[in-house]
């Protein structure tokens, strides 16, 4: 029996798959929907259609295909259409700043933005990043990320995203996208979808670690979980107008992410109404015709393997149209989607060529780095793009600090007689802030994790530097020990300190780097570099120990968090270049901590449920990672199994106190939901396709080695493609309906950006009064949770939140709304969102378990 996406996977992640018939299955969905320019895309779509109508076939293909790894200045670069003034598009990492560049800022990670619970700061960070990317001549930022969502706390790249809660992630994901695109740069929502672990994400990478597999991991999930958890933030991204989506390395129900017709054609383009373009993750492109028909619009970096000179697109895409296996309208739609995104963000007005090289810091070099060909020219212009962004970086760093525990130790007065700064995490990397490639080591303070989701630091203020400056202002003594294994000296300093500030960390990152035996994903949730022993030593010698944790997510603290000599605990995440200043702002009370933990702190790793899949379980085939927990991850799981966390999702203390009161609920719209009906328009072809002789390489063209071109070597299409299987019957690899350009039925849940417009109609207005009952100004985050009812639903789920600044003694009324999507469940039979007949109850408070206010909602449909 095959398990369709409409059914829950029935195999455990640890079990050995016995037969191919037992594998999860992703049903096909064709044809690939064509853009129609609805909503805010209208003007950009019209301009895109106009320009694409003037292009030849090979010019369109040039837009869809990267030129190859290390062939141009950016990590990804498309071909150009110089005849029409369309430049090569530069695509560059990362979600927290410009990777492989210089004179750029290193922003806090997405997980820190989540800890602020601040929509405005999410937007400001996005806008600041977009400005830097634009100033460097980058057209497409490869970020932000909502995949991984954070299914497992030990997932290597969770920190690149926001939170395991889809609502918190979705809001901040969307605000980040708006900020980036308001700066004139195309944002990329990634990694789509179910990219929840690093193990087995790429075959070559896994084989390099000694695993005998021939296909990447398959993330197997049921339809309800897909919609209510993992697809949720991507719907918010589409609704925000995101220009690009990056498909992921993993398979989804045993179909590769970049050729999965259900996730790309049905969910993203048909149901959510995505109007931009889908690009592959780097070398996540596995076929030509199959990927094109399944919805992949752009191949990155263009070559099949790095510097191979071969491509599934390029010449082969041209051949596919000429021999009829790929309809012209499909390639036209690819080009229209790319150009529509380009025009939508106003890139045509802001475009400048890249003024840096990803491959060298030398000022001069060859135009084409890998083959050392082309003009020898200035490749790095050393343009400083930082502006005043250090201010927002420091602000986010401070506002994302979560005060987990405070027994009166904080804030510090600045008059402490002796301050001990203890732990390697307080100091500098001996190799320098950028001493490890892609931050692939854990030395010194952890302000950024590792992998392609990184940026070079322009500088890094360490906690030791910043705190020493504070102590010197008060004429105190300050002693630091940053060797975690010198417990004798640590004890000596702790014993004479008025307050001991202990800095510890836990790192993770992308799977292409192995750091201390962690192949991207964390091996465990313990502290790194002997961190537990440092804390134990200090608490034995100092009765005023404050622990600061820089980490990629939760760590196990059960052994020491309740120790009476641990008087304060702060989580500071990955705060970027202003790390030391940000934590000093909080420690010394210039900033009243208002961060809330965006994940749950459990007592053991087992508290979180299913472990990562770290051993192959399907022979040498695709490892099968079954998401049997469904929607029950993080706090939802803790609630389901009545697990008591150490610190619950949404928890965070302040230097003041708040009180919530006066819950009011008002029905503002009782209209019924109307599923979308009708048909789309027919697919359109723009321009005409000539015979093969029109697409031969131009005479006199000096070809660059390994460069990916769109032209033909010969009018003999088989000779041009170089594919030994060329000429196989179409029915063997072209799915039924895949080339059909006739009007198609609209899905019930479709109809607008993010889905059916009725989902976003506000039904209820909710208001609450928040009073600052303390003596200092501070920030509070009222959080609204909904119980959807039903026997198999989470106890409650987050739906709304707002960060508010409130003066002492002041009251503020927070007003929010609940729309239909907030109250609905995914109906796997109707294939639509439905508000079930079960009672709906709302809860408002300051964490997922501190919810003093509650109210029952009237029934709506």
Swiss-Prot record:
It comes from the Eukaryota. GO terms for biological process: cellulose catabolic process. Pathway: Glycan metabolism; cellulose degradation. Residues 1-19 form the signal peptide. Residues 735-754 are annotated as: Disordered. Its EC number is 3.2.1.21. It is an enzyme of class 3 (hydrolase). Glycans are attached at residues 62, 212, 253, 316, 323, 355, 524, 543, 565, 669, 713. It is found in: Secreted. The active site is at residue 281. Beta-glucosidases are one of a number of cellulolytic enzymes involved in the degradation of cellulosic biomass. Catalyzes the last step releasing glucose from the inhibitory cellobiose. PANTHER family: BETA-GLUCOSIDASE, BETA-GLUCOSIDASE A-RELATED. Belongs to the glycosyl hydrolase 3 family. This is Probable beta-glucosidase A. It comes from Aspergillus terreus (strain NIH 2624 / FGSC A1156).
């Amino acid at each position: 029996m095959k398990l369709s996406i409409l059914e829950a996977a029935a195999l455990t992640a640890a079990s050995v798959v016995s037969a191919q018939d037992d594998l999860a299955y992703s049903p096909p969905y064709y044809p690939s929907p064509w853009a129609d320019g609805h909503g805010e895309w209208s003007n950009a779509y019209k301009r895109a259609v106009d320009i694409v109508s003037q292009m030849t076939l090979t010019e369109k293909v040039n837009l869809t295909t990267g030129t190859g790894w290390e062939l141009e200045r950016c990590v990804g670069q498309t071909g150009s259409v110089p005849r029409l003034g369309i430049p090569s598009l530069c695509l560059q990492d990362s979600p927290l700043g410009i990777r492989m560049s210089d004179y750029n800022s290193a922003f806090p990670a997405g997980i820190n933005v989540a800890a602020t619970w601040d929509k405005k700061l999410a937007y400001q960070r996005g806008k600041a990043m977009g400005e830097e990317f634009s100033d460097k001549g980058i057209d497409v930022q490869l970020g932000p990320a909502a995949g991984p969502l954070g299914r497992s706390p030990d997932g290597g790249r969770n920190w690149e995203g926001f939170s395991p809660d889809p609502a918190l992630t979705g809001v901040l994901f969307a605000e980040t996208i708006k900020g980036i695109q308001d700066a004139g740069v195309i944002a990329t929502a990634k990694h789509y979808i179910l990219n929840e672990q690093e193990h087995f994400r790429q075959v070559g990478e896994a084989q390099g670690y000694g695993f005998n597999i021939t296909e990447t991991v398959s993330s197997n999930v049921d339809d309800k979980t897909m919609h209510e958890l993992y697809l949720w933030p991507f719907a918010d991204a589409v609704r925000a107008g995101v220009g690009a989506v990056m498909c992921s390395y993993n398979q989804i129900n045993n179909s590769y992410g970049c050729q999965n017709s259900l996730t790309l054609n049905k969910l993203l383009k048909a149901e959510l109404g995505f109007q931009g373009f889908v690009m592959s993750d780097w070398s996540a492109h596995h076929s030509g015709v199959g990927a094109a028909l399944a919805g992949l619009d752009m191949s990155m970096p263009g070559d099949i393997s790095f510097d191979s000179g071969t491509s599934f697109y390029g010449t082969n895409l041209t051949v596919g149209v000429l021999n009829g296996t790929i309809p012209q309208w499909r390639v036209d739609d690819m080009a229209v989607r790319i150009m529509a995104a380009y025009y939508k963000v106003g890139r045509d007005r802001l475009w400048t060529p890249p003024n840096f090289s990803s491959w060298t810091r030398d000022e001069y070099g060859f135009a084409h780095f890998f083959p050392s060909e082309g003009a020898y020219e200035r490749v790095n212009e050393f343009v400083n793009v930082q502006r005043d962004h250090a201010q927002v970086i420091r602000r986010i760093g401070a506002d994302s600090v979560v005060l987990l525990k405070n027994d009166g130790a904080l804030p510090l007065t600045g008059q402490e007689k002796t301050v001990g700064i203890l732990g390697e995490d307080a100091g500098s990397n001996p190799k320098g802030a950028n001493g490890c490639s892609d931050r692939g080591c854990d030395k010194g303070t952890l302000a950024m994790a590792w992998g392609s989701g990184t940026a070079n630091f322009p500088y890094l203020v360490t906690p030791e530097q910043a705190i020493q400056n504070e102590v010197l202002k008060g004429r105190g003594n300050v002693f630091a020990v940053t060797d975690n294994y010198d417990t004798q000296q640590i004890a000596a300093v702790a014993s004479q300190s008025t307050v001991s500030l202990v800095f510890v960390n836990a790192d993770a990152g992308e799977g292409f780097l192995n750091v201390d035996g962690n192949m991207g994903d964390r091996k465990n949730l313990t502290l790194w570099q002997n961190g537990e022993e440092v804390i134990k030593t200090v608490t034995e010698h100092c009765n005023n120990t404050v622990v600061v944790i820089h980490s990629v997510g939760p760590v196990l603290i059960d052994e020491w968090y309740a120790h009476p000599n641990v008087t304060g605990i702060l989580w500071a995440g990955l705060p970027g270049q202003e790390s030391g200043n940000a934590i000093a702002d909080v420690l010394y009370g210039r900033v009243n901590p208002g961060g809330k933990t965006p994940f749950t702190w459990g007592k053991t790793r087992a508290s979180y449920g299913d472990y990562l899949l770290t051993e192959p379980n399907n022979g040498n085939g695709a490892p099968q990672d079954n998401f049997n927990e469904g929607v029950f991850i993080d706090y939802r799981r803790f609630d389901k199994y009545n697990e008591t966390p150490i610190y619950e999702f949404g928890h965070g203390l302040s230097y003041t106190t708040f009180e919530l009161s006066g819950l009011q609920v008002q029905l503002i719209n009782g209209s019924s939901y109307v599923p979308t009906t009708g048909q789309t328009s027919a697919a359109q072809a723009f321009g005409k396709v000539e015979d093969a002789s029109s697409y031969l390489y131009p005479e006199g063209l000096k070809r660059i080695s390994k460069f990916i071109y769109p032209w033909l070597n010969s009018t003999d299409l088989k000779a041009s493609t170089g594919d030994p299987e060329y000429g196989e019957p179409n029915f063997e690899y072209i799915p039924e309906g895949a080339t059909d350009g006739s009007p198609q039925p609209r899905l019930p849940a479709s109809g607008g950006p993010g889905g059916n417009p009725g989902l976003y109609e506000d039904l209820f207005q909710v208001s609450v009064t928040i009073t600052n009952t303390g003596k200092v100004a501070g920030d509070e985050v009222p959080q609204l949770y909904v119980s959807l009812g039903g026997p198999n639903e989470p106890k409650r789920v987050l739906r709304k939140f707002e960060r508010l600044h409130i003066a002492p003694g002041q009251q503020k009324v927070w007003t929010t709304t609940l729309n239909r999507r907030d109250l609905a469940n995914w109906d796997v039979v109707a294939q639509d969102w439905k508000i079930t007949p079960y009672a709906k109850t709302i809860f408002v408070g300051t964490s997922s378990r501190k919810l003093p206010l509650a109210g029952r909602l009237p029934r709506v449909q």
